[in-house]
Amino acid sequence: MVIGATLRHLARRASASSSRARTVAGALAGVAAASVAVADEAEHGLALPAYAWPHDGAFRAYDHASIRRGHQVYAQVCAACHSLNLICYRNLVGVAYTEAEAKELAEEVEVMDGPDDSGEMFERPGKLSDGIPGPYANEEAARFANNGAYPPDLSLITKARHDGLNYIFALLLGYREPPAGVEVPDGMYYNPYFPGGFIAMPKMLVDGGVEYEDGTPATETQMAKDVTTFLAWAAEPEMDDRKLMGAKWIFALSLVCVQAVYYKRWAWSHLKSRKLVVDAVR
């Protein structure tokens, strides 16, 4: 009897120890997962929210009014630091501006050209074939003007970042006061959506910072949406044409498929069921 009671007592103690071990292991796993999540957030930035962009989807096109407003935001806010090297004024024709409006925009810029007949360089008004000029002559000048930080070219920025549209939109609206205990280095700003949490670019969008030509209220969110749409177009200016061509091909191939099914199932059915009998005469 004593031996049996002892064995039962030892079994209960072993079961309790096993339960405590599982609890401790679960707690350690939770702490490890949380640590990994915090480290990932610090390295890659806060998880991005997902927004429904008007041009997402196989049969949806860009909002061209938003592209025009976005170009206005870029020209008045972003162009002070960021270039757009892969876009020419002619690319804006039929997308955001008429040809006359695009020419007027180009002529506002003085472009260095030449040499002329005497071998000298000269300045002339911009033309539709000219690219949109950048704010700095070279990378060194850009870094000198921005305390060592190099503002990236925005031509392909939505393709150069994971989930680019949501990233740009969240980044522009993500500036906030740092959490307690977080020290922001000099010349930097806290933005949890930027990898590392600190970014050299200050908050640029404020309500009413741009006066839209079409009278749309220039709220901070509206400006962020419009400039993000403009940058999406800058990265894929051919997207509307590509989707239209894809829709045409889908329609054409659907007709071919229907025709092929018709001929296989009905037009040629008598040929498939025909039997040839050879009666050999001996």
Locations of regions flagged by a protein language model:
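Electrostatic cytochrome c docking/interface patches
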Residues: 47-72, 83-97, 102, 215, ...
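The canonical Cys-X-X-Cys-His
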Residues: 74-85, 227, 231
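N-terminal mitochondrial targeting presequence
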Residues: 1-40
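Juxtamembrane/start-of-transmembrane alpha-helix segments at the extracytoplasmic/lumenal side
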Residues: 15-22, 235-253
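Extended, hydrophilic extramembrane loops/domains of integral membrane proteins
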Residues: 195, 201-236, 240
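Acidic, low-complexity proline/glycine-rich segments
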Residues: 33-34, 38-53
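Gly/Gly-Pro-rich "capping" loops immediately C-terminal to redox-active cysteine motifs
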Residues: 83-164, 186-214
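Juxtamembrane interface at the cytosolic side of transmembrane helices
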Residues: 242-245, 257-282
